[in-house]
């Protein structure tokens, strides 16, 4: 399999003059940041913008599964008062957390087995605030690559652990109660064409909020629609009151099909395991001891390109 970058095809916009082209090379495959960019990108007045992105494994993303250390990490988060440290580092986050906490209390529901109030509030905190999505995704993509950098600069330790733990607990609960192992969900990007070849293996490298309703996913944009068969994601409707499934950053997917339509691309993905670079990072443990090995990726290039073409209106 050749380098992903060699597969990138330019998007040529109809124009009577040569387009102004800006080529951005992003090393380390920061796919979470690119997904964030897809949600923020807007054409400026007098120009048209198209972004073409090739998928990869998002290897630089912080993807800790806390395998074999979940209890110890929870204790350390409490003992080290990481909630206060994280909240103080983010503007307005304490108010947002309080709002999420109140929203959960007002629902008056019983917590699922083994879950705490903090798990519930973390889900609401993440799903109710678009600003949290942006900041969290950016941080996961860039500021947690070494234990030292993680400790010093990653101010989402509390949220990352409780979201990861919540997904894992809810998935177990769903299997025990309903026998449901996997879900077909949908996700749509804005102003971005994602490209992948049938048979390729990719992952998103971020917490992805997807919809169980295809019609609802269509509100997200009109460029690339993902139909995803996830087996590691978990439904969060009990908390958010929306038919949502949260997909963890470490889930791997195989591209089953890709088709082109007038309004964009349609990718069908099927879960094929999990992959983590980091594990028990808060405890300064070696990630090499706990890396799952469903897929060998040494031969793949981790270079992702974004090609932006801007056309001036005549």
Curated annotation (Swiss-Prot):
<feature type="binding site">
    <location>
        <position position="126"/>
    </location>
    <ligand>
        <name>NAD(+)</name>
    </ligand>
</feature>
<keyword id="KW-0449">Lipoprotein</keyword>
<keyword id="KW-0548">Nucleotidyltransferase</keyword>
<keyword id="KW-0808">Transferase</keyword>
<feature type="domain" description="TR mART core">
    <location>
        <begin position="91"/>
        <end position="276"/>
    </location>
</feature>
<feature type="disulfide bond">
    <location>
        <begin position="182"/>
        <end position="231"/>
    </location>
</feature>
<feature type="glycosylation site" description="N-linked (GlcNAc...) asparagine">
    <location>
        <position position="178"/>
    </location>
</feature>
<feature type="glycosylation site" description="N-linked (GlcNAc...) asparagine">
    <location>
        <position position="257"/>
    </location>
</feature>
<feature type="lipid moiety-binding region" description="GPI-anchor amidated alanine">
    <location>
        <position position="285"/>
    </location>
</feature>
<keyword id="KW-0325">Glycoprotein</keyword>
<dbReference type="GO" id="GO:0098552">
    <property type="term" value="C:side of membrane"/>
</dbReference>
<dbReference type="GO" id="GO:0003950">
    <property type="term" value="F:NAD+ poly-ADP-ribosyltransferase activity"/>
</dbReference>
<keyword id="KW-0472">Membrane</keyword>
<feature type="glycosylation site" description="N-linked (GlcNAc...) asparagine">
    <location>
        <position position="114"/>
    </location>
</feature>
<keyword id="KW-0336">GPI-anchor</keyword>
<feature type="glycosylation site" description="N-linked (GlcNAc...) asparagine">
    <location>
        <position position="274"/>
    </location>
</feature>
<keyword id="KW-0521">NADP</keyword>
<feature type="binding site">
    <location>
        <position position="206"/>
    </location>
    <ligand>
        <name>NAD(+)</name>
    </ligand>
</feature>
<dbReference type="GO" id="GO:0016779">
    <property type="term" value="F:nucleotidyltransferase activity"/>
</dbReference>
<feature type="signal peptide">
    <location>
        <begin position="1"/>
        <end position="46"/>
    </location>
</feature>
<dbReference type="InterPro" id="IPR050999">
    <property type="entry name" value="ADP-ribosyltransferase_ARG"/>
</dbReference>
<dbReference type="Pfam" id="PF01129">
    <property type="entry name" value="ART"/>
</dbReference>
<feature type="disulfide bond">
    <location>
        <begin position="69"/>
        <end position="280"/>
    </location>
</feature>
<feature type="propeptide" description="Removed in mature form">
    <location>
        <begin position="286"/>
        <end position="314"/>
    </location>
</feature>
<feature type="binding site">
    <location>
        <position position="240"/>
    </location>
    <ligand>
        <name>NAD(+)</name>
    </ligand>
</feature>
<dbReference type="GO" id="GO:0005886">
    <property type="term" value="C:plasma membrane"/>
</dbReference>
<keyword id="KW-0732">Signal</keyword>
<keyword id="KW-0520">NAD</keyword>
<protein>
    <recommendedName>
        <fullName>Ecto-ADP-ribosyltransferase 4</fullName>
        <ecNumber>2.4.2.31</ecNumber>
    </recommendedName>
</protein>
<keyword id="KW-1015">Disulfide bond</keyword>
<dbReference type="InterPro" id="IPR000768">
    <property type="entry name" value="ART"/>
</dbReference>
<keyword id="KW-1003">Cell membrane</keyword>
<feature type="glycosylation site" description="N-linked (GlcNAc...) asparagine">
    <location>
        <position position="222"/>
    </location>
</feature>
<comment type="similarity">
    <text>Belongs to the Arg-specific ADP-ribosyltransferase family.</text>
</comment>
<keyword id="KW-0328">Glycosyltransferase</keyword>
<dbReference type="GO" id="GO:0106274">
    <property type="term" value="F:NAD+-protein-arginine ADP-ribosyltransferase activity"/>
</dbReference>
